[in-house]
Regions:
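Rossmann-fold NAD(P)-binding glycine/threonine-rich loop
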Residues: 127-153
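Helix N-cap at the beta1-alpha1 junction of Rossmann-like dinucleotide-binding domains, i.e.
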Residues: 55-57
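Rossmann-fold cofactor-recognition segment
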Residues: 70-82
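N-terminal Rossmann-fold NAD(P) dinucleotide-binding loop
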Residues: 32-33
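Conserved N-terminal Rossmann-fold NAD(P)-binding element of oxidoreductases
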Residues: 24-29
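C-terminal catalytic/substrate-binding lobe primarily of soluble NAD(P)-dependent oxidoreductases
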Residues: 175-419
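Conserved Rossmann-fold cofactor-binding substructure of NAD(P)-dependent oxidoreductases
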Residues: 81-93
Length: 419
């Protein structure tokens, strides 16, 4: 065991790694668990991984579970992702080729700073969000473009499902089926049931901040803002059925509006059941979704962070959750002067995900693309210095990898459109 600046690193599996790939995975939650499992399944690319988190025992648990089942060498470390010197010390000791950030969005910039100092490629699944402001956008990370270019390293932003696969779907549609895409509707449906009166399928703090914020969409190059849950539609999803869905603000709209030719409107919809919305409204009404600190028994606490502590851990939902997810994009545009529509989507089964990696499908659909994005960079298919959104790269190898690694996609050339 080696200790550096308060960082405990299990060094048992340290080895010379010429012509091998070394990945540092920061985070130990539900999505991180999927990334770790999929990297270990893909040992030809991920020959060595280091799992690092504030709580090293969580990392050690993954190592104990997987080390005898994989050819990937697994190391664990304790690190505070809010502390750039700690991150730098860990990277200098472990010497990763790439850092897969599946920690909190608040920590993106700290991790990017460490990657810059150590010249390590970077992948994340969600854009930066200031902890004290429920507002997420790409401007903070896009500001790193020139520095990453000069350092000769690649930052791949948003390599989850949405953002992530949805951007790849857009690039694929643009490359193969359209001369210009005028309308995109991103539909995120979770038809799963975990049996709890109220729980979130990913980090409760991030999830509740997202769905309680004002909605927005892009129309003719401008943001149009709506009240939370103001715009509702009903859609019949393949293998899930008819669901209520609501327009939300979502980060990929910002980059897709810049990178997809001919865009007139982009919207994002997510399904919610009535029980979830009723509970959320009650929590909002009593102040439990607030991010403003309050005084409690002589201490400052953030109500939403307290709520997160009492809600079920999303990583614990796997064995309870039944049903399927359906996430995809509906496109309208032009090809050879004619109107064209196209729908590409993935259906994922919660129970099948749990059988494979011990996770529900929400974490699975985020973690698999994070591994694939890292693989694209490590194998040179997407290696390009700078800070890039996922739709800026050739979608074909990523689309092939989705089929191989557990997220097969389907196409419909005559879909029902969203009004």
């Amino acid at each position: 065991m080696l200790s550096i600046i308060g960082i405990a690193v299990d060094n048992k599996f340290r080895k010379e790694w010429s012509n091998m790939s070394r990945a540092l995975i920061i985070g130990a939650g539900g999505v991180a668990g999927v990334v770790i499992h999929k990297c270990c399944q893909n040992s030809e690319v991920f020959t060595d991984i280091c799992i690092a988190s504030r709580t090293k025992s969580k990392c050690d648990k993954f190592k104990e579970e997987l080390q005898d089942k994989t050819k990937t060498n697994i190391t664990t470390a304790q690190v505070n992702a809010d502390n750039v010197p700690e991150l730098v010390a860990l990277m200098k000791e472990y010497k990763p080729d790439i850092c897969i950030n599946v920690a909190l969005p608040y920590q993106d910039l700290h991790i990017m700073d460490a990657c810059l100092e150590c010249k390590v490629d970077y992948v994340d699944t969600a854009n930066y969000e200031p902890e004290d402001t429920a507002k997420f956008e790409y401007k903070w990370q896009w500001a790193y473009r020139e520095r990453f270019e000069k350092a000769g390293i690649t930052a791949l932003l948003g390599s989850g499902f949405d953002p992530g696969v949805t951007g790849v779907f857009c690039a694929y549609a643009q490359k193969h089926y359209f001369d210009e895409i005028n309308y995109i509707d991103i539909l995120d449906c979770n038809g799963g049931d975990h049996g709890y009166p109220f729980a979130t399928n990913f980090n409760p703090e991030i999830n509740i901040r997202e769905v309680s914020a004002k909605g927005s969409y892009i129309q003719d190059g401008k943001w149009v803002e709506t009240e939370p849950m103001e715009i509702k539609r009903v859609y019949n999803f393949d293998q899930v059925g008819e669901k209520d869905m609501y327009l939300l603000h979502h980060e990929e709209l910002e980059s897709l509006a810049l990178n997809i030719k001919g865009i007139k409107r982009i919207r994002f919809f997510m399904t919610f059941g009535q029980s979830y919305l009723t509970h959320l409204k009650c929590l909002e009404d009593v102040g439990m979704t607030s991010i403003e600190p309050i005084d409690f028994e002589g201490k400052k606490i953030v109500p939403l962070q307290f709520l997160k502590a009492v809600l079920p851990d999303p990583a614990s939902l796997g064995p309870r959750t039944k049903g399927k997810t359906n996430i995809g994009c509906i496109f309208q545009g032009k090809k050879d002067g004619k109107d064209k529509t196209y729908y590409v989507y993935n259906v994922c089964d919660h129970q099948e995900c749990y059988k494979e990696v011990g996770s529900q499908a929400i974490s699975y659909t985020t973690g698999v693309p994070a591994m694939i994005g890292a693989m694209m960079i490590l194998t040179g298919k997407w290696k390009k210095p700078g800070v890039h959104n996922i739709e800026e790269f050739d979608p074909d190898p990523f689309m092939d990898a989705l089929n191989k690694w557990g997220l097969p996609w389907k196409e419909n050339f005559d879909p029902v459109l969203v009004d």
